[in-house]
Amino acid sequence: MTKSQRKILVTSALPYANGPIHLGHMLEYIQTDIWSRFQKLRGHECHYICADDAHGTPIMLKAQQMGITPEEMIAQVQKEHQQDFADFNIQFDNFHSTHSEENRILASDIYLKLRDGGYIKTKTISQLYDPEKLMFLPDRFVKGTCPKCKSEDQYGDNCDNCGATYSTTDLINPKSAVSGATPIMKDTEHFFFDLPAFEGMLKEWIQSGSLQQEMANKLNEWFEQGLKQWDISRDAPYFGFEIPDAPGKFFYVWLDAPIGYMGSFKNLCDKRDDLNFDDFWSLDSTAEVYHFIGKDIVYFHSLFWPAMLEGAGIRKPTSVYAHGYVTVNGSKMSKSKGTFIKARTYLDNLDPEYLRYYYAAKLNSRIDDLDLNLEDFAQRVNSDLVGKLVNLASRTAGFISKRFDGKLAKVTDSSLTDIFLAKSEVIAELYETREFGKAMREIMALADIANAYVADAAPWQLVKQDDKQDEAHQVCSNALNLFRILVTYLKPVLPKLAENVEGFLQLTLTWDNLGQDLAGHEIATFKALMQRIEPKSIEAIIDASKENLQATNTDAPKTEAPTQAVNQLELDPISPEISFEDFAKIDLRIARISKAEHIEKANKLLRLELDLGGDTKQVFAGIKSAYAPEDLVGKLTVMVANLAPRTMKFGDSEGMVLAAGPGGKDLFILEPHEGALPGMRVK
C-alpha cells in the first residue's frame, strides 16, 4: 500500500522528426514507460508526456528534398512515430510536437524573461557559410575533426567519441554536409544565453542528488574547462520559431526542444479540467518532474535547461536520469551511418513484449551501454517468459477448468504466498530506483520457486487418483495464485500480457490486491499467452536490416574470432599444464572499477581502484595504451584478488586485472555477463 499519493510528471527525450524510430531509441521509451506504469500501478498520479522535436535545418532540407513543406513532413513522421510507440505499448498520456502554438508561446515567454533579466547578450560572430547553397551552416551540417580528441567525421557541435561540445568554428578541416564545399567565414549577429552567470547555482544543483553521480562527475569536468555563453539563435532560412523583435533570426532548436516538455504538458492540461499546468511547473510546485534521457544529451539537460528555468523563474526538474547506448551483437549503433534496426522492422516479426522484457532485464540505474545480443535475447525470452512464467499457468489452469468447474480452491498452506508477498517492497524499491534488471532477477527467482513447487507436487499425477483430488485442486489453485502475483510484479514491463492474464483470471491486477484471497473465484478457459521465439523470426529481422547489421559488424573484432583464435595460438602457444591444486590457489573475483586515473610519468600504467563489494584494492594495470580512464569507471571486470602486493614506485599494486590481447591498443579487459556482482568468486 502506498502511504501517500505523489504527483509526478515524467518525460522521455523528444525524438527528432526527420526519420524512423529504431531500437536504440526504444530503450529510453521502454525504460520510461516501465517506470511510469509502475508509479501508476502503485496508485500515484503520474503523467508521461513526450513530443516530436520538429524544428531545425535538417528537417527543412529534407522536406525540400521530398518536395513537400516542413509542416507536411513532420506531420507524416509524427504519425509514424506514434504508431511505432503504440505498437510497442508505450503509454503516453500526451504526445505532441514542438511545432505547436503552446510551445511557441512558452519559448517566447521564457526568452523574454531571460532577456529582461539581462541573460541574453548579442554579438557579431564569424560563422561558417556554404558559398554554394548561400546559407549559414548549422552545427549538424558541418563535419570535420574534433578539436579535443582529433576524431574525424564529427559533427559541428559535439563529438560522439569524447562527448566534447564546441563551436563549429573550432572544428578542424570543416566541410559542408549539404554541398561538400569548404565553408567560408561570414559575419552575422547572434543572440547568446549567459550560461556562466548560473555557474554557482548549477554547481550546487548537480551535487544536490538530482543527477546520477557519473553525470555529476562529468559535469564537474566541464566546469573545470569553464562555462561559455550559449548561442541560441540561427539565421534564416530556418524552420522554427522566429525570435521576438528580431526579424530573420530564429531560436536554435535546442532552446525550444526542452521547452517542448512544457508545451506537451500544457496541451494535455488544456484538454483536461482536472490538470493545472502551474501545479507542476511553478517555482513553488511540490510535484515531481523527471527527465529520462540518453547520455549524449546530458550537457543540454543538466546545464542549459536548468539555467534557463532558473533565469525565467520556473522550477527545475527533480531529477535527470541518463542511460547508455544500445549496441547490437556487441557493435555500436549509429543513426548517421544507418546502422540501426528500425522499430517497425522488429514489430513486423516479433512481439514487442519480448524486447520490453529483455531491455528491462539488462537495465540498471547507471549509464552503462546495453547490448542487444540477438542470440541471448531469444534464449532469455524463451527461458524466462515462456519456460518459467507462462508455463506455470499452462501446466495448471487446464485442470481447474476441466476438473474443478473453473473455480479456485481455498489454499490452506500460505507459506509460498507469504514468500512471494514478502518480496513486494523489495521489488517496488528496485522499480523506483530504476534497477529493473535486479527486479527481473528477483521475480524470476520467485518463478523458479513456483515451478519447483508444481514439479514436486505433480498435479498431473494427483488428478489420476480419486483420493488426491482435493490436493490437486489445492496445488493448481496455489500455482495460479503465485502466477497472478508474478504477473502483477511484471505488469509495468509486460502490459499486454498482464491484460490478457486479467482476462483469463477475470480480475484486475493491482499492487494493492496482491494478497487477495481467490477462494471460490472463477477463471476463464486458459489460452496460450506467449509463443517461443523461433530462429526464423530473428533471421527475418537480420535479413530486413542486413545492410545495417553488416555495417555495424564491420567494426566488431569478434566477427573474425575463429581466424584470430587460430593465429593467436600459433603466435602464443598454450602454456604447460598445471595441477588443479595449483589453479585452485588463484582467487578470481568480480570487481567494479570505482576509480581510474593516469599516473604521472607512467607510459603504460593506469591506477585503478577496484571495489570488491566490501573491500577496495589498488591495482596498477598496464592498459593505458588501450583505455582512457573515464571509459573504465563503473565497469565490472575480473581480478586476481589474492596476489601478493607488489611495491612499485607509484605505490603498492594489490592484485591484477585480467585482459587479453597482444598489447598496445589491442588489449581487452574481461567483463563479466550481466548479473555478476562485485566480490563474487569466479569459478
UniProtKB/Swiss-Prot annotation:
Cellular component terms per the entry's GO annotation: cytosol
GO BP, one annotated term: methionyl-tRNA aminoacylation
Signal peptide: none
Zinc among keywords: yes
Domain spans labelled tRNA-binding: 582-683
Annotated PROSITE patterns: AA_TRNA_LIGASE_I (PS00178), TRBD (PS50886)
Enzyme class, UniProt record, top EC level: ligase
Quaternary state and interactors: Homodimer.
Known role: Is required not only for elongation of protein synthesis but also for the initiation of all mRNA translation through initiator tRNA(fMet) aminoacylation.
HAMAP family with a match to the protein in the record: Met_tRNA_synth_type1
Protein name in the entry: Methionine--tRNA ligase
Organism: Shewanella frigidimarina (strain NCIMB 400)
Gene: metG
